[in-house]
């Protein structure tokens, strides 16, 4: 772990405990894991308390008013305005991507991403870059030709 990796504070939001545990095991050697949550209300409270640099955010999370990840993002801005959000979801539907990007997520990757690519994506959004999973990027490139 280098010094830049250690200083990046990460929070993980996903309603599947086993998935969160796997992500934490993958990221813990590289980053400071400061919190985790499984629903809208718990996520907003955790983000307000821990003020992470980056939140890995599932799109479909129970609770709140039914807005899932987009709702968490919008409600958390007031408490942690400098936090960057990277959506990490099993879904790659345009509706899901659009909802969190419109809400302010810096990127969107699918859960098929490798551990190394996830680490790289976190560093990139932390540095201010937008990140999208290779499948979404390829679809955009093809659509513009």
Please annotate each region the language model reported.
Residues 1-9:
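Non-catalytic signal-transmission and effector/linker regions of two-component phosphorelay proteins
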Residues 15, 88-92, 111-113:
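Conserved active-site segment of CheY-like receiver
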Residues 58-60, 89:
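Active-site residues of response regulator receiver
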Residues 67-82:
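Short amphipathic alpha-helix used as the core "switch/output" element in two-component signaling
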Residues 17-35:
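Two-component/phosphorelay signaling modules centered on CheY-like receiver
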């Amino acid at each position: 772990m280098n010094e830049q990796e250690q200083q990046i504070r990460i929070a993980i939001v996903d309603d599947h405990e086993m998935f969160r545990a796997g992500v934490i095991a993958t990221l813990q050697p590289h980053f400071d894991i400061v919190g985790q949550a499984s629903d809208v209300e718990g996520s907003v409270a955790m983000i307000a308390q821990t003020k992470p640099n980056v939140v890995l955010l599932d799109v479909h999370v129970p609770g709140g008013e039914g807005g899932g990840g987009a709702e968490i993002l919008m409600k958390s801005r007031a408490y942690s305005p400098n936090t960057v959000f990277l959506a990490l979801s099993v879904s790659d539907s345009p509706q899901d991507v659009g909802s969190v990007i419109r809400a302010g997520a810096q990127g969107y990757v699918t859960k098929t991403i490798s551990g190394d690519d996830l680490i790289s994506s976190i560093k990139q959004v932390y540095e201010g870059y937008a990140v999208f999973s290779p499948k979404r990027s390829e679809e955009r490139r093809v659509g513009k030709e």
